[in-house]
């Protein structure tokens, strides 16, 4: 790719990277409206399952998440703000519909979503974590089962 084209259309390489993240990031693009109480449990499970699927399929996004952790600029801050806004909206909806206190939903959602992201980045470099090799389908299936168990007890 020509540097001239990058600068013409995106302004800088960092702007190009940010646009890729904005278009692909699960939490930036997630719909912030959720179903009723009867479908809430399945919705939350599907939400985390989709985050896993996306990160397992998009290796470039995982690498860009690593890059994002190493920089602090206005574009990255914009991405982080959008994730935060969407996350808080979802937590508020889930709390209101489920009757579970906001702080509990907030904490559990933070633990689960950050664990998925970390394990996807960790698995990308071929490491084993607590005996699980996150390059394998079996390890990810075990993680999904664990998430489902948490969601079942929580919502």
Per-range role (PLM):
Residues 31-57, 61, 100-112:
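Hydrophobic alpha-helical connector segments
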Residues 17-19:
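Short, Lys/Arg-enriched C-terminal cap helix and immediately downstream tail that follows
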Residues 43-57, 139-155:
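N-terminal hydrophobic signal/anchor transmembrane helix of membrane proteins
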Residues 53-89, 133-137:
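Short secondary-structure transition hinges
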Residues 21-28:
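Short, basic, alpha-helical segments at the C-terminal edge of helix-turn-helix-like DNA-binding modules
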Residues 94-148:
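Hydrophobic/aromatic-rich alpha-helical bundle segments in the mid-to-C-terminal region
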Residues 28-34, 73-99, 106-110, 141, ...:
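Amphipathic alpha-helical packing segments from all-alpha helical-bundle domains
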Residues 1-15:
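Helix-turn-helix
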């Amino acid at each position: 790719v020509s540097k001239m084209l990058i600068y013409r259309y995106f302004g800088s390489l960092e702007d190009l990277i940010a646009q890729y993240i904005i278009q692909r990031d699960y939490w930036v693009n997630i719909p912030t409206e959720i179903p009723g109480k009867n479908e809430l449990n399945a919705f939350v499970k599907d939400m985390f399952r989709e985050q896993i699927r996306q990160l397992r399929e998009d290796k470039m996004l995982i690498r860009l998440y690593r890059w994002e952790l190493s920089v602090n600029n206005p574009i990255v801050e914009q991405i982080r703000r959008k994730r935060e806004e969407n996350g808080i909206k979802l937590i508020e909806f889930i709390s209101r519909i489920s009757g579970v206190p906001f702080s509990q939903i907030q904490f559990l959602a933070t633990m689960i979503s950050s664990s998925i992201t970390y394990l996807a980045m960790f698995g990308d470099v071929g490491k084993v974590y607590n005996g699980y090799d996150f390059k394998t389908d079996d390890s990810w299936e075990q993680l999904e089962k664990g998430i489902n168990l948490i969601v079942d007890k929580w919502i």
